[in-house]
Amino acid sequence: MSRMNKIEDLLHKEIANIFVTRIDNQDIKNNVTITDIKVSKDIRRAIVYFTTLQNNYKKIELSINALKSTIKFYLSKNVHLKRIPDLKFIHDDTVLKGQRINKLLDTLK
């Protein structure tokens, strides 16, 4: 496992933990799952992909991005890296795309 993969795994685990233990927003706490994290080579930026059980993912995406500084603060307390990357949260739509493909395949039967 490369160093970058280890950093991504560490951030994944810690952000998921922050969502459960430190965030008061129940929509985020109960309905959001981190699916993937991609960190830039210089560790200055990280894109955090998430899914949600709710249909209002745009609202949740805005709420999470509004909490970026809080999440970064807690990361700095728990993760020992030279630099904590700037975070950008993006809804992971692969599940929705998969559902659409399944519906199309069902119509072909």
Predicted features and spans:
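Charge-rich, low-complexity N-terminal segments
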Residues: 1-45, 51-109
